[in-house]
Amino acid sequence: MTTHRAGKMFGSTCLALGIFAVSLAASAEDVKVTLTGAEEVPAVTTKAMGEGTIAIGKDMSVSGTVKTTGIEGVAAHIHLAEAGKNGPPVVTLIKGEGGAWSTPPGAKLTEEQYKAFKAGNLYVNVHSAAHKGGEIRGQLKP
């Protein structure tokens, strides 16, 4: 009977460790981001601002929301470029209510984009009618 209990305990321990390992692999890195006109390239003088959290999983999944104020945003994206440079959009954000912009369900980065994230070379950009290239921006710094 002792052997049976030990075997059950060993099996339960292995199962728990396996679940823990899977959850670590899928865990996300939460990055707080603040968006301002000063971060734009070139800089924009604006009272608009934004803040939020973007989570990037080790499986390259992307989730999160940024909340903006003082801006009537017409589009928002996560772009690929280092601070001080402009780059192409890689994830289009979905406009919600009250100035909220969220990642679409199932959003994922490519391997190249994930490496760029780890190097600090992704940013969130909110565009307005007055500033089509972007009015506020915030670099994602892991």
Model-based region annotation:
Residues 2-14:
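Bacterial N-terminal signal peptides that target proteins for export
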Residues 2-4, 18, 23-76, 80-142:
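Metal-centered catalytic cores of metalloenzymes
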